[in-house]
């Protein structure tokens, strides 16, 4: 049967397409908006059956043009948290998602979609409960509002609906994201260009570089998506993070040491990297004060209860793999 991946030329979508290929799945309809043409590179080493622009896709899917569709991996969205055009964001992330959901429900198609930890905003608890959800930007609100629709629909849905609140995802195929690419990606490029990585200094009680996030490898994100794809009886909204909060220092230090290893140099401790000027701390910008999350950490209780028991890569493991991959692309 046919599979559909929206946002297929994007970061997570392309990784899902590649992972499906590795399982022998090639009857895939890739849906995206290639106005930003450089995203095509993410699909060059992938096998797909057809490509459709997102505007054409919604109408044809609703019309039943693709026959029996087993599953839709709905990764297509505007993920720029700095976007201020609310009308664009709501149309692209909310209305579009509702249209795809409605057709999946009507046709009995598995619906696996990208939500976001941005829904939690400035909360200090990261559990899938309404009372801790307080998005700080229109991107987070667009994801929040769609999750509320899902909560209303789930009790009567006859087919799978699985939403994943992605935390800070990093890994291959994110180059096109520019300023919205991961910290690991930017640290890698900064070190190659300047010979050092710059991190924020002390802020809000956190020592320099010790602000923490739940950094999750796209490898793990893909594995979780495929686990639920294999278990259509499991529905719900789930946090998708490692369950560990690790400091930005860990990202930077791993980037530096992996690049040193590739250059046949020995690893250094964080203190040694700072002492040698390989990591530099800059004053925390005034523009971000009061708007910056110093801590995120996924509560994995629901995910584990659903039966997903595989370990998640640590920053040291995942960023090391990613830097080696990036180095091979240069």
Curated annotation (Swiss-Prot):
One of its GO terms (molecular function) is NADP binding. NADP(+) binds at residues 11-12, 32-33, 39, 54, 75-79, 92, 143, 169, 177. Pathway: Nucleotide-sugar biosynthesis; ADP-L-glycero-beta-D-manno-heptose biosynthesis; ADP-L-glycero-beta-D-manno-heptose from D-glycero-beta-D-manno-heptose 7-phosphate: step 4/4. Gene3D superfamilies: NAD(P)-binding Rossmann-like Domain, UDP-galactose 4-epimerase, domain 1. Substrate binds at residues 168, 179, 186, 200-203, 213, 292. It comes from the Bacteria. One of its GO terms (biological process) is carbohydrate metabolic process. Pfam families: Epimerase. Keywords: Carbohydrate metabolism, Isomerase, NADP. InterPro entries: Epimerase_deHydtase, Heptose_epim, NAD(P)-bd_dom_sf. The active site is at residues 139, 177. SUPFAM superfamilies: NAD(P)-binding Rossmann-fold domains (SSF51735). Its cofactor is NADP(+). The keyword Chloroplast does not apply. CDD domains: ADP_GME_SDR_e. It catalyses: ADP-D-glycero-beta-D-manno-heptose = ADP-L-glycero-beta-D-manno-heptose. Binds 1 NADP(+) per subunit. The keyword NADP applies. Its EC number is 5.1.3.20. Catalyzes the interconversion between ADP-D-glycero-beta-D-manno-heptose and ADP-L-glycero-beta-D-manno-heptose via an epimerization at carbon 6 of the heptose. Contains a large N-terminal NADP-binding domain, and a smaller C-terminal substrate-binding domain. NCBIfam families: heptose_epim. Homopentamer. Belongs to the NAD(P)-dependent epimerase/dehydratase family. HldD subfamily. This is ADP-L-glycero-D-manno-heptose-6-epimerase. It comes from Burkholderia lata (strain ATCC 17760 / DSM 23089 / LMG 22485 / NCIMB 9086 / R18194 / 383).
């Amino acid at each position: 049967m046919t599979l559909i991946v929206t946002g297929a030329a994007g970061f997570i979508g392309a990784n899902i397409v590649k992972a499906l290929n590795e399982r022998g799945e090639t009857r895939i309809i890739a849906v995206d908006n290639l106005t930003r043409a450089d995203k095509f590179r993410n699909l060059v080493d992938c096998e797909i059956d057809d490509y459709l622009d997102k505007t054409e896709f919604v109408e044809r899917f609703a019309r039943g043009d693709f026959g029996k569709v087993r599953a839709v991996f709905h990764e297509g969205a505007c993920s720029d948290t700095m976007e201020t055009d609310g009308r664009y964001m709501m149309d692209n992330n909310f209305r579009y998602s509702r249209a795809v959901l409605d057709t999946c429900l009507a046709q009995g198609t598995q619906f696996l979609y990208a939500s976001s930890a941005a829904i939690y905003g400035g909360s200090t608890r990261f559990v899938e409960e309404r009372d801790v959800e307080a998005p700080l930007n229109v991107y987070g609100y667009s994801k929040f509002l769609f999750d509320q629709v899902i909560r209303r629909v789930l009790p009567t849905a006859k087919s799978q609906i699985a939403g994943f609140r992605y935390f800070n995802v990093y890994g291959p195929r994110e180059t096109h994201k520019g300023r919205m690419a991961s910290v690991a990606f930017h640290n890698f490029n900064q070190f190659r260009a300047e010979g050092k990585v710059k991190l924020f200094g002390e802020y809000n009680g956190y020592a320099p570089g010790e602000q923490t996030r739940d950094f999750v490898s796209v490898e793990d994100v893909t594995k979780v998506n495929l686990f639920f794809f294999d278990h259509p009886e499991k529905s719900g909204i789930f946090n998708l993070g490692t369950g560990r909060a690790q400091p930005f220092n860990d990202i930077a230090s791993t980037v530096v040491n992996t690049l040193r290893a590739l250059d046949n140099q020995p690893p250094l401790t964080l203190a040694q990297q700072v002492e040698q000027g390989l990591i530099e701390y800059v004053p925390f910008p005034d523009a971000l004060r009061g708007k910056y999350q110093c801590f995120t950490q996924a509560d994995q209780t629901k995910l584990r209860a659903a039966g997903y028991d595989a370990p998640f890569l640590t920053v040291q493991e995942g960023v090391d793999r990613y830097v080696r991959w990036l180095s091979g692309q240069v």
